């Protein structure tokens, strides 16, 4: 009987329905302190102020708790990338640079989510809901890469959009993980992580022969204007004399 009393005492102050959120927040705090692999299920319970048995009401194990955090992270990540991409406005290169900067901003401002998403060691296909959230976020990068691939000059071999998406994702992830998370122990840079990533992307695109000027893509030409009724037609050199 005594352990039930202890459990009730430990959970005092938690109303029905918010224990799950308390556990998620506790896990985020622990990730910030110890990393995604540095805490146990019991640690999360202790941080939330509940008994070791309480988390099992909402999560099968620690991996399921981490998967739930990673899923939320990918949902926030998708929203941020979508806003940054803005359907490629005002031009593809500028919009893509915004996506890269959004990637770095997420890693810097949401380090616990970022760690759960990319450093927890969870198998990507073990949780269908998590996998779907991850794919939706990556779809933004792939859509942007498809627009970049379409910029290939005529007659030049066009790399597969998926390959370009993976290349540029690797660049963004590398800069974010190595330099962009505000960790004082990480190597100092003589430039901002955003400037480093922008230079990498431009060098990559120019190496492929892509134009990298920031001009809006031309719109399809419409029919020529109709001259006023009774007026002689004008050619490319003006009105004939």
Where are these predicted regions, by residue range?
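Amphipathic alpha-helical linker/stalk segments
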Residues: 72-96, 118, 128, 132-139, ...
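Short secondary-structure transition hinges
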Residues: 109-143, 185-190
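N-terminal intrinsically disordered/low-complexity leader segments
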Residues: 1-18, 212-241
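Amphipathic alpha-helical packing segments from all-alpha helical-bundle domains
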Residues: 82, 125-151, 162-166, 195-206
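Hydrophobic alpha-helical connector segments
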Residues: 82-112, 135, 154-168
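Amphipathic C-terminal alpha-helical segment
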Residues: 147, 166-187, 203-214
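Short hydrophobic clusters on alpha-helical segments that form packing/core surfaces
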Residues: 23-31, 73, 77, 103
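Helix-turn-helix
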Residues: 22, 26, 30-64, 68
